[in-house]
Amino acid sequence: MNFKDLRDFLDYLEQRGELKRITHPIDPHYEMTEISDRTLRAKGPALLFENPLGYDFPVLTNLFGTPERVAMGMGRQQVQELRDVGQWLAYLKEPEPPRGLKELIEKLPVFKQVLNMPVKRLRRAPCQEIVWQGDAVDLDKIPVMSCWPDDVAPLLTWGLTITRGPHKKRQNLGIYRQQKIARNKVIMRWLAHRGGALDLRDWMEKHPGEPFPVSVAFGADPATILGAVTPVPDTLSEYAFAGLLRGSRTEVVKSISNDLEVPASAEIVLEGYIDPNEFADEGPYGDHTGYYNEVERHHVFTVTHVTMRNKPIYHSTYTGRPPDEPAVLGVALNEVFVPILQKQFPEIADFYLPPEGCSYRMAIVTLKKQYPGHAKRVMLGVWSFLRQFMYTKFVIVCDEQVNARDWPQVIAAMVNHMSPLRDTLFIEHTPIDSLDFASPVVGLGSKIGLDATAKWPAELAVSNSDQSDKTTELSLEALKACLSDEADVLDVALPEAANDKLVLLLINKQEAGQAQQLLQRVVDKLNGDSPLKFVILCDDDVNIHDWNDVIWAMTTRMDPARDSLRIVGQDLICFDATNKLPDEVEREWGTPIRKDPKLVAKIDSLWDELGIV
């Protein structure tokens, strides 16, 4: 499938019932988010809001709201075919000459596609049919969405930010959210390790104080959009990779006000510069973690020109608690990651980033184990091989027969094959996502690896505790009786897959230190006689009978080293996955995203009329 532009892709989706046009007037402020969120959770179509209240441009959301549409955008019929894309990337990351005629023939399709990597430069392009400049630049005319009740301002989300460092020939494409603060200014929120920020840093070193050119394209063709979120090798441009995906060269045109090349078919392009000395407070915004992030200082992007197609479509999205569109992209791109990892670690059978773990904070790896300690090598490899995994806090390694996408199987492997103290690896003071408010300081926190593989004799010889003689069964009734005098415990779960070795507790937390004190009392009451290996403590807003809820709480509310209580005498680990109170942490704790009940009721009344799903 070869889509020349976004409109071509939308036609394709509409023919297959994967696009819904909404003619009813809908407000970009909050209403579009509520409708898009419901549609995505129902695995519904992409949405084209043709009459946004107060604006002339239609708004496209939920474009990549299912893994299947991501695959279509990459020119594939099935999600499983995305592993072919991963094999391409693995080869391009570490190319090897063919080792014979047979391998040459096998790799001919890849070699042929390389012809599509160079860009095709146009002198005129659809994205420059209309031009705003000077006083005509007015971002207030674009239907930029406001997503959540406590968001500070409207937020541009799907723009492909195009930069070039002074020492690089190739451009960088990245997707960074942008807070609108004026008719011609937005705040560019990019993390220090991202390509755009690195280009700016190099520019500031070579051209101190000079404006840094930037262009931002909205509504490019699907291959170019997805190329910007795929882990392409540093030596490969996103435009070149888009050409590989599409099967035809990426068409670009030079920006009107700078030398940066933008997608020729983009719907809207913002051009301008970043003044290295101009900053502003960004946020708070409801983010993909399900919380509002902290306010941070970031550079301001001044827009000097806006170019667009005739009757442009504004491409947008929202981010919130999984599942959201970034989480769906994560599920699809997971298939791309597997061959890349297998190129370096052939012993990896499967690799999964659960969306409930914010798509990157937890990884499940299944392994063809070959020697003692193999699982720990793989943990360290995951953390160090690709920068996409530098923020992964939890890595669980299981044997190859375990289905990494099935929580009962993963939990069974943990309780049956782990000695919690021996088979957990803690690493402190490591890079952590700045949005992770559970880390002790911004950008720095701990990681945990859990070796849930069957142990070899050499591994069994290094044991912290022998639980083989703990034959006492632990029933749910007995556990509840044991905790009957604990008024703070609201619910108890003993999952069937856990084989009496893992318990989840729901508590009403009101005071600092309450969770840790409760965990210690639970340990004392069990008195070393129970078969328990793991205790997980959650707040009363978590459904402890739903692994999706539990994993979300663990990955958003824990710093593994700080919030793990290790009981040496009983070979037991307790995880405190509760919200931390001000006296427990120094950082500002995240506030969960809450929907406005009045807005929900309004969309309820419209829902049947919209006829989306």
UniProtKB/Swiss-Prot annotation:
Its EC number is 4.1.1.-. InterPro entries: UbiD, UbiD-like_C, UbiD-like_N, UbiD_Rift_dom. It comes from the Bacteria. Keywords: Cell membrane, Decarboxylase, Lyase, Membrane, Ubiquinone biosynthesis. It is found in: Cell membrane. GO terms for cellular component: cytoplasm; cytosol; plasma membrane. Catalyzes the decarboxylation of 3-octaprenyl-4-hydroxy benzoate to 2-octaprenylphenol. This is 3-octaprenyl-4-hydroxybenzoate carboxy-lyase. It comes from Vibrio cholerae serotype O1 (strain ATCC 39315 / El Tor Inaba N16961). The gene is ubiD.
